[in-house]
UniProtKB/Swiss-Prot annotation:
Protein's name in the database: 4'-phosphopantetheinyl transferase B, mitochondrial
Native species: Aspergillus fumigatus (strain ATCC MYA-4609 / CBS 101355 / FGSC A1100 / Af293)
Keyword Membrane: no
Subcellular location: Mitochondrion
Protein keywords: Mitochondrion, Transferase
Matching Gene3D superfamilies: 4'-phosphopantetheinyl transferase domain
């Protein structure tokens, strides 16, 4: 049998996150803000603060522990974590070629509010710089969050 390669360079990545693991991490003393700064791009950090009505980092509230971590916050962060891991796996050069902040999860304006993954152009600045858009699906079920990314390579 003669095998014919698929005619389009497509890559797929999937990741599953156990929500209690994320909850354990972000509930550790002084780790919540460290975790969000580590995995979220600046735009995603702003989106997170806006979505959950959190004060800006300059307010000092993060040091006082005044912001209780809600299950919705944990679910949102777990979704971003899974999406970014899936995006890294779908990257044409492989997961090790991308850092956490090299990809952004954003809500697509033209696609009825569906989330999408953006591979940032290393020469761009993220928000105003260029990037490549990939398809993203995130699903939440009980203690698990799963994300799948389809990217052209």
């Amino acid at each position: 049998m003669k095998l014919i390669p698929f005619p389009y360079p497509l890559n797929i990545g999937t990741d599953v996150v156990h929500l209690p693991r994320i909850l354990r991490l972000i509930n550790r003393p002084d780790y919540f803000h460290r975790f969000t700064r580590r995995i979220l791009h600046e735009q995603e950090q702003r989106d997170f603060r806006t979505r959950f009505s959190l004060p800006p980092p300059s307010s000092g509230a993060e040091k006082t522990g005044l912001n209780p971590i809600t299950p919705d916050m944990a679910r949102w962060l777990a979704g971003r974590f899974a999406a970014k891991e899936a995006a890294r796996k779908a990257a044409p050069a492989g997961a090790s070629s991308l850092g956490w902040k090299d990809v952004i999860v954003r809500v697509g304006e033209a696609d009825k509010g569906r989330p999408e993954i953006v591979y940032l152009d290393p020469m761009g600045c993220g928000e105003t710089g260029g990037g490549r858009v990939g398809k993203l699906s995130i699903s939440h079920d009980g203690d698990y969050v799963v994300a799948t990314v389809l990217a052209a390579g």
